[in-house]
Amino acid sequence: MSIHIRKMRYLPLVAALALAGCGGDDGGAGSASALSSAGAPHTSSSPAVTAPPSASNVDKSVSPVELPDTVVPVNYRLWFRPNDALNAFDGRADVEIKVLKPVNNIVIAGHRIKFTNGRITLQPGNIQLIATPQDKGDFYQLRPVAGTIAPGNYSLHMEWSGIINFKSYDDPATQTGGSCGDDPYPGCSAAEGVFRVDLKGTDGKTSGAILTQGETNLSRQWFPGWDEPAFRPTYEVTAEVPQSWRVVSNAAEKPSTNVGGGYKLVQFEKTPPMPSYLLFFGGGLFDTYEDDFTSPLPGGKGGLHLRVFTPPGMSEWAKPAMDRTKQALDYYYRYTGIPLPLTKFDTVAANDAFKEQKDLNFGGMENWGSILEFADDILPQPGQPMSHYGNEVLTHEVAHQWFGDLVTTDWWDNVWLNESFATFFETKTTIQFFPNEFSWLDQVKNKYRVINRDIGPNAFPVAPNFNDWASNDFVLSASAFTYDKGGHVLKTLENYLGEQTLRKGLQQYLVDYSFGNGTPKRLWDALSKESGQAVGPIGDSYVRQTGVPLISLDTQCDLTKNQTVVTLKQQPFPNKNAYPGLQWTVPITLAYGQGLAKRTTLALKDTQAQTRIEGCTGVIADPSGLDYYVVNYSDTAWSGLLTQVNSSTDPVLLANLKSEAALLVANNLAPASRSTSIGSVASPAAMKLRQTPTFDGIEAVTKERPARQYQGLFKPRKVVTQ
């Protein structure tokens, strides 16, 4: 899910995990520059198509966290109808379920909905169920009047009414009234469950429309059910809407039927198995721009019909978004070798009454087959290019179709498995398709922004593993780590393992856990199998604790063997963390030799290690400038490094050294001469860097991503998921 880059007030967890959704890197938008292709290597062509590996015989399921595992939903037949005022709706569902063992009740999630008395039944047997609210209305027990429910296959019928959200509050100052005024939880937003937007056409006229937002646990405001990632039923959506509306959902639309009164019945094909938060519906006076995507895979497997839904009169504005969508799909098809299990792919671009107030709190959502964006981000006026942010947010949401939708995180403390990957891939696609908008220097700047946050008092692990402290304190700032730090960790792993090794490992991960759930261990195991390296200790040490490792590097020349002895030590970088990291397994790349052209890698798992390299030479750690650790060189090592850097043509390497030195000096870990010496380098790289006024080293962080909104406190995990 994509989010707006703006300062927000801190909210307890909950605020942290629902409306952050996906999307765009908040570290300096890449500037068009001659340095766009400098630094870390990348290819200029799309990835070559490779066949994905065969699936392994693995368990792709996980245990639910909040709901019992005794009842499993198989398929939803969902119907709903908004009222004329677009402030409420009626809903009903027939859900095929499997009861796995005798139960006294069926527990489902539901929030701000009202069940219709006498309209909850179980078939066969015509068993009447009574809905009893639990946990402030977030869950219900559906109890039979007498007896228990035996194991077997059933059809659960439910009817209810719900609210269509439109305003956050009637009085924002006092947070009273309006659609959220009766909600006791913090961070209530208009974009929850079913919500209304005002489409504004090119003629200036506005019209009401409805959209849905399910992440993280907001779909329970639309329909009651099994609202967590462990459950993946299929869905068949039906709705009664005004005759003039165009509608969109995850699956392809069937022919509609006139039901009178100015309304029509619209129906959609069955979706792939997916978690409830990805289910989507949109309806209103949309225009559409259409095209087709031709799959690059053998036999054209996985071709898609594409549409962009726009406000009235803006269909021609959607051409750039259509082009970007086709580019992104082509890239991800090639990279993964896996086609989407869909027949169509839609992008819904809605402008709305909330954009000026920024109450929606996000920039996009990865609903499977129907991503949600906003018009001012991805619909430039005819003849104008799409904004950098629009490109990022669109490619971010498309990446989620694989990382998040095809394979879904097991629970929200591992949402980085969705978001870090989408952030990582939005960078890759920007390099591929928009090189004039990309600069590796901005990636260096972003890394140090994140490091500054990571050593501060409000740092959180990328994967916090919710417990008592996290449930209460996982605030908005956590999203800087869920998205950005996680993306930098993935880049560090790519630098260490190699681009193609990482790619093949990710292909195995996606194939093995398609239509299932990913976990960190499942990811690490796939990468370890492909690389032959123990990736788990590296990955867990980075995502499960805060802070950044400080690497001390010393060199000594062994003249008798013509070798350089490199001594490496690690400790936590000085920080203000409440729960600081202590030790990492750090994947280190060393560059050495003439022009720093030679490479060697090692994983520093102990507090100290030594390695030898051929020749008496200057050595630099992290030659890409993008690895997630800070290096403090001894005087001897620094002197040898400067000798090599003085002839360097890589401004990214120099930019990293400059930022690194500034950080060390600011924390009294290195003398001031460290900064002045790197600042006086007169290499070709330095000349390029000085011609880039946008690069000025470390910047204070003034912007935060709003994070996901959650209704209440997440249930703590008792054990770390494997």
Language-model features, listed with the residues they occupy:
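Gram-negative bacterial Sec-dependent N-terminal signal peptides
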Residues: S2-D26
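Bacterial Sec-dependent N-terminal signal peptides
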Residues: L17-T50
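Acidic/His-enriched low-complexity segments
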Residues: C22, H42, P47-T343, T347, ...
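Hydrophobic alpha-helical and helix-loop surface patches within well-folded domains
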Residues: A29-A34, F115, F268, G300-K301, ...
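A ubiquitous short alpha-helical element
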Residues: D59-S61, W79, G313-E316, D410, ...
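Non-catalytic, well-ordered alpha-helical scaffold segments
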Residues: P73, Y235, E419, G487, ...
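Structural motif
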Residues: D84-L86, E228, D468, S479-Y483, ...
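Long, ordered, helix-rich scaffold segments
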Residues: Y448, K561, V565-T567, A578-P580, ...
